[in-house]
């Protein structure tokens, strides 16, 4: 592992004395850690403190072992077609462990079979109708409906539209149910009818505003994407798990002199005569922390409480950002128990929304990641991850862990035709309120919140509630927040306006 040597050293001091400006980052998830890291690289003269309320950093990025096999409990990959996440991985010294998925492709469950997805999808919108027809994913009636997109009048799009509503209107409901829903529910844990097209598919949204046909808009979006992206895999991972990223980030930050505290709940955030005053700690044992600038990098419900009294507009709009809960059930099967000694071919499967299955998607982790297969096979196992729960199915997560694990195992056995094979080891990870929902109007709401909070001197905001739930999107937003602080905070701790 190559250890970076160009990160400035910092040393914590109280604001006021022999002045090194003090910046506090509230939140030690990937957004908060990435903001602190970028700030440390931009400015050599700052004291940086990260305050995380939970026992560990990382937020939804976590990896742990199950029967000696390391498997991510949250996100397992980053988008490699944009630079932020890959660059960060390389900067913190994990570049040698950067890996890409195998060539195995996901399947779609069409009872009773797992079938390949058609090629050329743009957020579930088809661009290759011949491939779609060959796949059998859409019925003959559904296929006949799609070309009407070229002749029906253009659908007016104003500031935003539901992606489910828009695609359904242009291409028919089958495309939404069989293609758009499986792909988007895996990312947003929500039905397409509830998801903002502008937020979830900004490129397609922009193209659709200028095209009469959605099919044409999807084709132009795909062409632009191919022009902008160099040849290479779309996704990337880290050998040993994406969950290593926040742990190594913490080590690098601490090595650079930053303070990273866990179990440090920020209870209040208030303006001080100069900068900010934070109340930190347990309810009966709080302490005061002073900061010249603050980067708020927490989930919307937490941010709502912290901005109370600072901005009525931001507080109100943050309180309206809903969240949804999900669970990831990791299962290790003994190879000897599986029909043919393995799970079906492919990297896993997605389920259409009309299938009404409790598992919305399953990843055959041993097929998708060579490093997982190496570790699992050495112990005689095959690793599978099952994703459960979405905004319209909260009941499935009300089961206890044992019940949820049994339900996941039974459903995967049915869909993947595993017969009587059941996992030898199971791990249930719950992410309560883990994903912000992105309804129609989300982009404008996020902008209003940002403007309201960043009108306050010495405050910047980032996190998954704003510009995207993906790791790369979170890092990008965090780096923007860090740049704002770097540019505005003077060496004397004063905040420059403009």
What are these model-predicted stretches?
Residues 40-66:
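Glycine-rich FAD pyrophosphate-binding loop
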Residues 2-18, 118-119, 126, 344-345, ...:
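Conserved flavin/dinucleotide-binding core of flavoenzymes
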Residues 125, 144-268, 290:
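Active-site/ligand-binding neighborhood in enzyme catalytic cores
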């Amino acid at each position: 592992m190559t250890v970076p040597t160009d990160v400035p050293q910092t040393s914590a001091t109280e604001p006021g004395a022999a002045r090194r400006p003090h910046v506090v980052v509230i939140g030690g998830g990937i957004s908060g850690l990435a903001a602190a890291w970028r700030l440390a690289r931009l400015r050599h003269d700052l004291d940086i403190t990260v305050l995380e309320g939970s026992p560990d950093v990382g937020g939804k990025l976590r990896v742990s072992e199950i029967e000696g096999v390391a498997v991510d409990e949250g996100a397992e990959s980053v988008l490699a077609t944009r630079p932020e996440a890959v660059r960060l991985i390389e900067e913190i010294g994990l570049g040698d462990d950067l890996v890409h998925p195998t060539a195995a492709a996901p399947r779609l469950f069409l009872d009773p079979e797992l079938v390949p997805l058609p090629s050329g999808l743009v957020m579930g919108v088809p661009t290759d109708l011949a491939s779609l027809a060959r796949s059998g994913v859409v019925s003959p009636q559904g296929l006949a409906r799609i070309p009407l997109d070229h002749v029906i009048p253009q659908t007016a799009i104003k500031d935003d539209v539901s992606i489910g509503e828009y695609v359904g209107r242009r291409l028919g409901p089958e495309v939404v149910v069989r293609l758009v829903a499986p792909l988007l529910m895996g990312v947003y844990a929500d039905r397409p009818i509830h998801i903002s097209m502008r937020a979830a598919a900004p490129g397609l949204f922009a193209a659709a505003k200028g095209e009469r046909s959605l099919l044409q808009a999807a084709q132009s979006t795909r062409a632009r994407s191919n022009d902008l992206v160099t040849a290479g895999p779309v996704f990337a991972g880290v050998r040993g798990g994406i969950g290593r990223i926040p742990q190594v980030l913490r080590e690098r930050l601490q090595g650079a002199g930053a303070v990273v505290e866990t179990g440090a709940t920020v209870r209040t955030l208030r303006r001080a005569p100069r900068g900010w005053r934070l109340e930190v700690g347990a309810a009966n044992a709080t302490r005061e922390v002073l900061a010249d600038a603050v980067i708020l990098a927490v989930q919307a419900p937490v941010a709502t409480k912290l901005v109370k009294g600072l901005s009525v507009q931001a507080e109100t709009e943050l309180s309206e950002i809903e969240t949804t809960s999900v669970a990831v059930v990791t299962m290790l099967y003994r190879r000897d128990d599986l029909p043919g000694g393995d799970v079906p071919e492919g990297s896993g499967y997605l389920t259409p929304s009309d299938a009404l299955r409790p598992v919305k998607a399953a990843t055959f982790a041993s097929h998708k990641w060579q490093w997982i297969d190496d570790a699992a096979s050495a112990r005689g196992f095959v690793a599978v991850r099952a994703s459960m729960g979405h905004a319209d199915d909260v009941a499935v997560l009300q089961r206890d862990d044992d019940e949820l694990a049994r339900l996941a195992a039974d459903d995967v056995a049915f869909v993947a035709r595993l017969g009587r094979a059941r996992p030898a080891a199971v791990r249930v990870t719950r992410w309560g309120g883990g994903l912000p929902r992105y309804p129609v109007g989300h982009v404008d709401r996020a902008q209003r919140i940002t403007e309201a909070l960043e009108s306050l001197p010495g405050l910047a905001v980032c996190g998954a509630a704003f510009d995207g739930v993906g790791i790369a999107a979170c890092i990008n937003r965090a780096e923007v927040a860090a740049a704002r602080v770097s540019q505005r905070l003077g060496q004397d701790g004063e905040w420059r306006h403009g």
